[in-house]
Amino acid sequence: MITPAGNCIYLASRSARRRDLLKQIGIRHNILLMREALSRPADVDETPLPEESPADYVYRITHTKSEAGWLRLKQRGLPLLPVLAADTTVVLDGRILGKPQDIGHAEEMLHALSGQEHQVYTAVGLTFQGQTRLRLSTTTVRFRDISPREIQAYIASGEPHDKAGAYAIQGKAAAFIINIDGSYSGVVGLPLFETSQLLEETGISVF
């Protein structure tokens, strides 16, 4: 097996949360920008397909992101290091809740999640030498009842923007959560157990 030199990877994501999680386990990484400029369209269409299950959805998006990152790496003539990608979605009663499109959409999501259990699916993928390995983390999150005033105040904080399900477990939304069953880091956006497995399989040791 060809192993990467220097125990360094590329992260195909702009997410500060995923960067922080990689730093937490001591993984050196560089950011691989998937767009040359913000005005250009994204490489990955994140629209769910008809009848696509939540697991299949995050697997597909992650696989596409990871392989697109590897291709971009080769096109730019950058060092051929592993490319890590991930995708997170929130699922309520089988319905995929992506990132809110606007304030009204965020309010609708939070009202729906109030007092309910939902699932958070995060897939992580690592592409190296043209081979992509995938793992999936599934976590159940239980919200307490959230008042309309709290929803409005939370939206005003700006935290729901660009978050799957319109909330961030590592932020103020932690006050809404009664308990979780599964991976905290998976809900944040990068399940560290599954990520470390992929890294080990590719020849990168966390320890």
Swiss-Prot record:
Gene Ontology biological process terms, A to Z: nucleotide metabolic process
Primary subcellular site in the record, as a coarse category: cytoplasm
Record-listed E.C. numbers: 3.6.1.9
Active site location: 87 (proton acceptor)
Signal sequence coordinates: none
Site residues by UniProt (Important for substrate specificity): 17, 88, 170
Any Pfam family matching the protein: Maf
Catalysed reaction, written as an equation: dTTP + H2O = dTMP + diphosphate + H(+); UTP + H2O = UMP + diphosphate + H(+)
HAMAP family, A to Z: Maf
Summary of the function given for this chain in its UniProt record: Nucleoside triphosphate pyrophosphatase that hydrolyzes dTTP and UTP. May have a dual role in cell division arrest and in preventing the incorporation of modified nucleotides into cellular nucleic acids.
GO molecular function: dTTP diphosphatase activity; UTP diphosphatase activity
The protein's required cofactors: a divalent metal cation
Keyword field: Cytoplasm, Hydrolase, Nucleotide metabolism
Subcellular location: Cytoplasm
Enzyme class (EC, first level): hydrolase
GO cellular component: cytoplasm
Transmembrane segments: none
Record-linked InterPro entries: ITPase-like_fam (IPR029001), Maf-like (IPR003697)
Family indicated by similarity: Belongs to the Maf family. YhdE subfamily.
UniProt protein name: dTTP/UTP pyrophosphatase
